[in-house]
Each structure stands twice: as C-alpha cells, then as structure tokens.
Design a protein with these regions (language model features):
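Short, solvent-exposed helix-to-loop capping segments enriched in aromatics
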Residues: 35, 112-129
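Short beta-strands and strand-coil junctions in structured, solvent-facing domains, enriched
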Residues: 51-53, 73, 80-83, 93, ...
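Extended beta-sheet lipid-handling architectures
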Residues: 43-45, 59-61, 74, 86, ...
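N-terminal leader/targeting segments and the immediate start of mature chains
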Residues: 10-57, 71, 213-224
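Bacterial N-terminal signal peptides
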Residues: 1-9
Length: 224
C-alpha cells in the first residue's frame, strides 16, 4: 500500500512538473508563431452536443475548410447532410433534405461567431488575452498527440451569459487546436468541436466557398 501511495504521489508530481513547464506566455507565444503563417485549414470534424437535463449526447461528423480571408465551410455528412458557409459577414445554413437555406447577416455578432468556431486558428495572443482570462489546465494525450489544455473565461458579460468557459486542447507540434469545448451558462450543457486529420496551408480554391446549392432552393432570413 505504501509503495502504491508513493507511486501515485510520484505521478502527481510529474503531472504538476509537466504543467509547470508550460507558462501562459510560452504557450501563447508558440500559438503566435503558428498564426504568423496560417493561411488555411482542412480537417475532419466531429461536433458533439450534450444536453444535461435529459442526459442526451448528439454527434455530427463531416469536414471543415477554413481560409484566413474570413471564409469557412463546414460540410456535415452524418447523420443528416447540412452545409454551413461563412463569407465575411454572411452566414448560410443549407439543408438539402428540405431544399432550404437560412441566411444570416452576422453584423455585430461576427466576433462571437469567430470565437466559437475559429478560436485558435490564426488567432493572435493579443486578441485572446483581450477577450479571455487564460489559465493552463495541464497536458493530455489526444488522438496520439501531446496537447496542452487551456481554459478561457470570457471577459464580456454578453458572451459569459451564454458561454461560461472554453477549454482548448492545443497540439504541441502544430500549435493549433485539436479540440474545443464550450460550457453553456446555467444548464450544464456543452458543445464540442473535435478536429481530426487536420492539414494546415493546403490550397483551397474560391469554388469551395461559393453558394453551390440548387437555384430552386427556398431562402429564409430568420430574425436575429
């Protein structure tokens, strides 16, 4: 029993030392270096939504394409086909099952959308510090990658009324997020984005960010 306690104590000490090796300044500095040459990202994506009151977990999978010039496309493949397209201040959600596309003008909500989906992809540390209180949670292995986990607490009351904190798993090789977990306010609910087989700076043509749904599509502009 004594030897087991000593072993556990040793593991805790090693974990504490591993965390101590990374400072917030050091991590954000490495993320800044990665952001300097960030142009594009492609990855398989897993989106998980947990609803606490009914203990329900739903999962969507697909692909994401991001370009630094404010363009993003998410193609959901399972369980139901869906396309989310963002170009600048315009956001489109296309549902082929009902042949309908919802159109949103992001306007003042633009920065909030960027923080939800694009957080950590080419984001400068000054912008992260401006918007969040940052702390280091520790190191974890995820997808056979060594990652450091950051916890971000929004400074904005408006955002904190929706999201109380965000955890980001940062790949220590690429210094890009492998996973982001968003904890919703007052409910115990969370949603998570998991990026698999991520490739940085592959060429993504303009065609990937065009509205390529049928001309017969029904267009709807929901109220903000």
């Amino acid at each position: 029993m004594l030897s087991l306690c000593c072993s556990l104590s040793g593991l805790r000490t090693l974990a504490a030392q591993a965390t101590a090796n990374w400072t917030i300044e050091g991590i954000l500095g490495m993320m800044d270096k990665s952001a300097q040459d960030f142009r594009t990202l492609t990855a398989d994506i897993e989106h998980i939504k947990y609803t606490a009151v009914v203990k329900d977990t739903s999962t969507e999978t697909g692909h994401i394409f991001v370009r630094r010039d404010e363009k993003m496309r998410i193609e959901i493949a399972k369980p139901d086909l869906r396309t989310i397209l963002r170009t600048g201040d315009s956001l489109f959600v296309y549902n082929p099952k009902i042949n309908r596309v919802e159109e949103f003008d992001l306007g003042k909500n633009r920065s909030m959308v960027d923080q939800y989906v694009l957080l950590g992809f080419g984001t400068k540390s000054d912008n992260i510090r401006k918007s969040y209180l940052v702390s280091v949670v520790g190191e974890e292995e995820l997808d056979h990658k060594k990652t450091v986990v950051l916890e971000l607490t929004p400074k904005s009351d408006q955002i904190r009324n929706q999201i109380i904190k965000i955890q980001m798993w940062i790949d220590e090789a690429s210094w890009l997020p492998v996973q982001q977990k968003f904890f919703e306010a007052g409910s115990g609910d969370y949603f998570l984005f998991h990026y698999i087989n991520a490739m940085k700076n592959l060429k993504i043509g303009d065609g990937k960010f065009k509205q390529d749904w049928p001309k017969s599509v029904s267009r709807v502009k929901p109220h903000a």
